[in-house]
A protein has these predicted regions:
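Domain-scale recognition of functional cores that engage charged ligands
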Residues: 1-180
Length: 180
């Protein structure tokens, strides 16, 4: 069952990335009148500064949080897609570590999918998004701060990836370079 869900989620995220890419580039979805222009262009989440930009691998949403529910028939349905600032994975990772320590027999008895490589894969996907012409790149996790509801997530992932956790006030721009 999970293999089918996994394939569907991968397909869904690819479709969402292609949709976003079309909105900011070819705009075929508007020409074909699939989606009204005003619906997108009047959205507070539409960034006209992104028009004409084409991120590497057309990956507008490098991280996606898809909320699934199970209906009364036992079918899984997508409740919502979180593409802007998905959060929650750190709680799952932390929970899995605790569960493995407390109930190791469950992990040997059942085929529990491994999640221990998540932070490494996230780090690698971030590296792959760095433009090739960048000299001496540095990655950070940018957080609004300790009062943000996703702060645990930000600090956990920064620690797991071995990169700095910074707030906007920790950064400054000089001669078109960002410094910490």
């Amino acid at each position: 069952q999970w293999n089918k869900i996994s394939r569907g989620l991968i397909q869904r995220v690819k479709a969402l990335n292609l949709f976003i890419d079309d909105v900011y580039n070819k705009k075929k979805i508007f020409k074909d009148k699939v989606v009204p222009k005003d619906l997108i262009f009047n959205s507070p989440y539409y960034l006209k500064e992104c028009d004409g930009i084409s991120p590497k691998f057309k990956a507008w949403a490098n991280i996606s949080g898809v909320d699934l529910i199970r209906n009364i028939n036992g079918e899984y349905l997508v409740l919502e897609d979180n593409l802007r600032v998905p959060s929650g994975v750190s709680y799952m990772l932390e929970n899995r570590m605790v569960m493995r320590d407390v109930f190791p027999e469950l992990f040997t008895r059942y085929k529990v999918a491994s999640v221990h490589q998540y932070s490494n894969k996230l780090y690698q996907s971030m590296i792959e998004c760095i433009p090739k012409k960048t000299d001496n790149p540095h990655m950070v996790v940018l957080t609004p701060g300790i009062y943000n509801s996703a702060y645990f997530e930000h600090s956990f992932l920064a620690e797991q990836m071995g990169i700095a956790l910074v707030e906007g006030k920790d950064l400054f721009v000089e001669n078109d370079y960002v410094y910490m």
